[in-house]
Amino acid sequence: MSLLTEVETYVLSIVPSGPLKAEIAQRLEDVFAGKNTDLEALMEWLKTRPILSPLTKGILGFVFTLTVPSERGLQRRRFVQNALNGNGDPNNMDRAVKLYKKLKREITFHGAKEVALSYSTGALASCMGLIYNRMGTVTTEVAFGLVCATCEQIADSQHRSHRQMATTTNPLIRHENRMVLASTTAKAMEQMAGSSEQAAEAMEVASQARQMVQAMRTIGTHPSSSAGLKDNLLENLQAYQKRMGVQMQRFK
């Protein structure tokens, strides 16, 4: 799973199901693909979204700011700063500073995520706030590790389940990951289709998959309902590849 796919999975796992979730998923995909480069418009859109908690908006704002290239002098947004202040608790700020010092020594996404998972959500949010306010700098990869650790903690508390250190067992995250991977596979099928005889068939399968993912995000479904979605898509893709005589290992 690529880094950006993983970030998208974790961030979407804390967004409530509904039409807005499908819309946010599309914005994240566009931002990660470099298609949306107007950070100011994106932040204004995010600020006015209903339903989302201030912390979720803060995390999304942080992710957009990390990803979208912007002018150096661009003003930081108050709604993100307020969400990432650790509820104004000085203990959270103290822990955030300690965590920040540890993150400075990390160079990988997974290393940063593992270090961050031992801190409370308040401390993690405060640490994001430090980085967002330019009071500290870490690599984008490390910052994404911090984001995913925060989302995992929020998803865990939402599901009232205990975190496993080695692997993510949280069904909300697994469910979202299946849908993100299904979307990614659908995109691959569309790219492969080209002008071949089977192009129409491939486009149809990809289109159905996109609609299914969008419907699942909009209506909200039980985490187990997406279990077969990715497998069906991968089977379709492999059957299509076989007929085309194409091998694309990364989608297997």
From Swiss-Prot:
It holds the Pfam family Flu_M1_C. GO terms for molecular function: RNA binding; structural constituent of virion. Keywords: Host nucleus, Membrane, RNA-binding, Viral matrix protein, Virion. InterPro entries: Flu_matrix_M1 (IPR036039), Flu_matrix_M1_C (IPR013188), Flu_matrix_M1_N (IPR001561), Flu_matrix_M1_N_sub1 (IPR015423), Flu_matrix_M1_N_sub2 (IPR015799), INFV_M1 (IPR037533). A motif (Nuclear localization signal) lies at residues 101-105. Residues 1-164 are annotated as: Membrane-binding. Residues 165-252 are annotated as: RNP-binding. It is a peripheral membrane protein. It is found in: Virion membrane; Host nucleus. Most abundant protein in virion. When expressed alone can form virus-like particles in transfected cells. Plays critical roles in virus replication, from virus entry and uncoating to assembly and budding of the virus particle. M1 binding to ribonucleocapsids (RNPs) in nucleus seems to inhibit viral transcription. Interaction of viral NEP with M1-RNP is thought to promote nuclear export of the complex, which is targeted to the virion assembly site at the apical plasma membrane in polarized epithelial cells. Interactions with NA and HA may bring M1, a non-raft-associated protein, into lipid rafts. Forms a continuous shell on the inner side of the lipid bilayer in virion, where it binds the RNP. Determines the virion's shape: spherical or filamentous. Clinical isolates of influenza are characterized by the presence of significant proportion of filamentous virions, whereas after multiple passage on eggs or cell culture, virions have only spherical morphology. Filamentous virions are thought to be important to infect neighboring cells, and spherical virions more suited to spread through aerosol between hosts organisms. Homodimer and homomultimer. Interacts with NEP. Binds ribonucleocapsid by both interacting with genomic RNA and NP protein. May interact with HA and NA. Cannot bind NP without genomic RNA. HAMAP family: INFV_M1 (MF_04068). Belongs to the influenza viruses Matrix protein M1 family. This is Matrix protein 1. It comes from Influenza A virus (strain A/Goose/Guangdong/1/1996 H5N1 genotype Gs/Gd).
